[in-house]
Amino acid sequence: CRCRPDWFNGTAVVDLKSCVDASSRGFSRAIANLGYDIQAAFYVDGMKAVTGTELPFLFVAVEKEAPHAVALYRADPEIIEVGRKKCRAALQLLKWCQDAGSWPAYQPGGEIELISLPRWAANTDAFEFDAA
């Protein structure tokens, strides 16, 4: 395991995150949307392997826009547990891909898929020109 916490003092793992919305509601969305739960679990487990103790994980959320509001959050146990489950699933998928020599993406069966322009881009009326 390799991790680089932004700050570690032996009592907590701290990660600094820039965000659009540092409110608890906004930042909890960022945690879910950006996979910060996976990172938190990985860091907590990695530091436990080194220290022998499961330490709290703290997020320092800093808004990108002035006045750059700041909030400090401690990840609740559910965040860590959900992150662990996602991490385990990702590692199982990685192992399967390596063992099978297959890296499925958008066409897992290898089929060729027909693709079309989006409806808005196929509007040819916008491109007609009357020179008369």
Per-region residue spans from a language model:
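Alpha-helix initiation and capping sites
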Residues: 1, 8, 33-37
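Conserved catalytic cores of phosphodiester-cleaving nucleases, focusing on short active-site segments
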Residues: 3-29
